[in-house]
Amino acid sequence: MQKWIVEDWEFIIKVIEGEAKHCRLGFEKGDVFTCQYEVPTGFCPKTMATVHTLCEIVRCGGSFKLRGSDKEYEIDFPCADGCIYFHLVARPINQ
């Protein structure tokens, strides 16, 4: 595979609340995932739909403030099952 697009954003997803015993994948507070456009290795496929939507907001020039966040490029959100809470940070790169 030959990637031909240079991405403009990097996303850091950190588990901020939850216990491994409540998550099928064993996520717990402090776990961190990083990605650009691809799915982060080992990340929850059910929650990825939410992550993709949030990432597209930023890629299209939007802001998380319109989704209720106090910060333009940071937002907290629950997993698809509501057991784990994440903090997403969008960081510009290659700009």
Role assignments for model-derived ranges:
Residues 62-95:
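Short, compact, well-ordered microdomains
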Residues 18-20, 37-43:
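Short, charged beta-turn/beta-strand-edge "cap" motif at the junction between a beta-strand
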Residues 45-62:
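Short, compositionally biased
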Residues 2-14:
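Short, basic/aromatic beta-hairpin or loop at an interaction surface
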Residues 13-23:
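N-terminal first-folded block
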